[in-house]
Swiss-Prot record:
GO biological process terms held by the UniProt record: cytoplasmic translational termination
Organism of derivation: Stenotrophomonas maltophilia (strain K279a)
Protein name as catalogued: Ribosome-recycling factor
Family note: Belongs to the RRF family.
Gene (name only): frr
Top-level lineage group: Bacteria
InterPro entries the UniProt entry points to: Ribosome_recyc_fac, Ribosome_recyc_fac_dom, RRF_sf
Length: 184
């Protein structure tokens, strides 16, 4: 019973960290990575919300630009529209599209660091809420007389250790992203 609660809490905490990492990949650092275009959608064959990576290959042209090569050359105009809508500036090179990523200004980098910290704080809050849910489940087991007070204390301590470990992981992810932002 306690192990199920701990495993469930660990799984949910890991999902919170994964969600944070996914969110942080979409923050532009000035370095070009294909993950920046994960949320770009295009109007392909009548479907207005087709992900870009399903209609084109995305690769790094160099450290500050991406190359989008459509699988169907007739899709170039739609891909350009999708990129413009996502606030990118595409340059068409015949059968491919280049996207330049200018390095952000110092002021913009500081704004991005604040955004990263805010996202990190959101992940920490989610982890603390998961801890609270797990502790409530443990308290319910005591109330139902399924476990003793000693087991409750041990379970709560284990949940707290999980929480501390996962919050350290969030801090590391946030610190790494801040370092990446400020080193451009």
């Amino acid at each position: 019973m306690l192990n199920d609660i701990k495993n469930n809490a660990q799984t949910r905490m890991a999902k919170s960290i994964d969600a944070l990492k996914h969110t942080l990949t979409s923050i532009r650092t000035g370095r070009a990575t294909p993950a920046l275009l994960d949320r770009v959608t295009v109007n392909a064959y009548g479907n207005a919300s087709t992900p870009l990576n399903q209609v084109a290959s995305i690769s790094n042209a160099d450290a500050h630009s991406l190359l989008v090569t459509p699988f169907d050359k007739g899709m170039i105009k739609e891909i350009e529209k999708g990129l413009y809508n996502a606030e990118f500036t595409p340059n068409t090179l015949g059968t491919a599209i280049r996207i330049n990523m200018p390095p952000p200004t110092e002021e913009r980098r500081k704004e991005l660091v604040k955004q990263v910290q805010k996202e990190g704080e959101g992940a920490k809050i989610a982890i603390r809420n998961i801890r609270q849910d797990a502790n409530k489940e443990i308290a319910k087991l005591v109330k139902d007389k399924a476990i003793s007070e000693d087991e409750k204390k041990r379970g709560e301590d284990d949940i707290q250790k999980l929480t501390d470990t996962n919050i350290k992981d969030v801090d590391k992810v946030v610190a790494d992203k801040e370092k990446e932002l400020l080193s451009v």
